[in-house]
Amino acid sequence: MSEFDAQRVAERIDIVLDILVAGDYHSAIHNLEILKAELLRQVAESTPDIPKAPWEI
């Protein structure tokens, strides 16, 4: 994902829900982890470096 697109995220969540309905929990969790990582990476790229608090190191 190069930029945040709410429609695309919603579509991917729908896919995960379909996978859950089919009963493939492992794949659904894996897909959610991938989506989370992509979103966090995108946020990290778009925000300036903020010093971490000592408990976040």
From Swiss-Prot:
It comes from the Bacteria. Coiled coil: none annotated. Induction: Expressed approximately equally in exponential and stationary phases (at protein level). InterPro entries: UPF0509. Belongs to the UPF0509 family. It comes from Escherichia coli (strain K12). This is UPF0509 protein YciZ. The gene is yciZ.
